[in-house]
Every structure is written in structure tokens, then in C-alpha cells.
Amino acid sequence: MRLSDVLILTRARFVSATGSPNLEVRAGFAADLMSDALRYDLSGALLVSGLATPQVVRTAEMADVAAILMVRDKVPPPEALDLAEELGIPFLSTQLTMFETCGRLFAGGLLPCERCNGHK
């Protein structure tokens, strides 16, 4: 799925200067606990979160996430945006809740990530 599809499905917008609507995301994962995110293979994935801190960007960097989508109309602080732009990780935001965001993305064809050990 391309970020352009994510933007349409979730009525999201870019909140960072980094990012192209043509960027492909291979799967999706949602969490506010970043330790949970590190248990899954998020390489090339869309990370959906309500955590608007630099920690989400650091986790995205470690997990090789393709893009971050904030829910509930959250906008990350300047230091998180600066870090994301420095690392080339697009930041998006939607007014939708995490539940509705994930439902729309799944219904639109975005598949979930698998755990790093291969179990679903």
C-alpha cells in the first residue's frame, strides 16, 4: 500500500516535510508501548501510534519502519519532527482513533506485521 492510500483511507495529512505519497508500506502495526513494537518485524511497515514523542521515532529507526501515523490528531513535538526528518521517516497524523484507523487500513488491504520469531 502506498502512503497516498493511507492518506485517503484515514483522512491523514503529512506533519513532516519528509515523505512521498508514493512511498510503499508493506504492512501495518499499532502500539503505544514501543517495547511491543520491537517484538515484531516492522521493516518497511507503517507504525500507527498515539505516542507523540521522540521515543516513537527512535523505535521506528531501530525497527526500520517506513512511516509513522499518529492518531487522535496528535502532532509530535518539534524535536520528534526534527529527528524524523533527519532520519528520513515520514510523519503523518489523522483525527481518527487508533481503532478506526486500523480498521480502515485493514479493510483497505494493509496486512499486519508478523512477530520477529515468525509466529503470528
Protein language model regions, located:
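Feature captures the catalytic cores and cofactor-binding loops of soluble hydro-lyases/lyases
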Residues: 22-23, 29-46, 50-120
